[in-house]
Amino acid sequence: MRTPAQFLGILLLWFPGIKCDIKMTQSPSSMYASLGERVTITCKASQDINSYLSWFQQKPGKSPKTLIYRANRLVDGVPSRFSGSGSGQDYSLTISSLEYEDMGIYYCLQYDEFP
């Protein structure tokens, strides 16, 4: 009979490309900006995430809204003032000319690896 530790060892052999947990660091943590200003938010992954990154906007009392997927692809209906860029570990979201309706919480999500 195999012990759980031996079983885990077998499972890991089946997934040779398995990665460690990926830590995402977003900056700045908060910011103030004026209307019409260019704003950039960055997100850094602890390892290469192969551009599997989305950016979301959330307003108080509302569900998150996807703005960008695959690092730089704009979701249909999202204004063109939003853009995403980056590769490997470093990514950014830029709002070219800030509008009042852009006020909210922004965050990134990697989906190269799930917990």
From Swiss-Prot:
Signal peptide (residue range): 1-20
Region Complementarity-determining-2, residue ranges: 70-76
A GO CC term attached to the entry: immunoglobulin complex
Region (Complementarity-determining-3): 109-115
Keyword Chaperone: no
SUPFAM superfamilies: Immunoglobulin (SSF48726)
Region (Complementarity-determining-1): 44-54
GO BP term, example: adaptive immune response
Region (Framework-3): 77-108
Keywords: Adaptive immunity, Disulfide bond, Immunity, Immunoglobulin, Signal
Residues covered by region (Framework-1): 21-43
UniProt key word Acetylation: no
Covalent S-S links between cysteines: 43-108
Entry-linked PANTHER family: IMMUNOGLOBULIN LIGHT CHAIN (PTHR23267)
Identification of the protein by name: Ig kappa chain V-V region L6
Species, as recorded: Mus musculus (Mouse)
Lineage: Eukaryota, Metazoa, Chordata, Craniata, Vertebrata
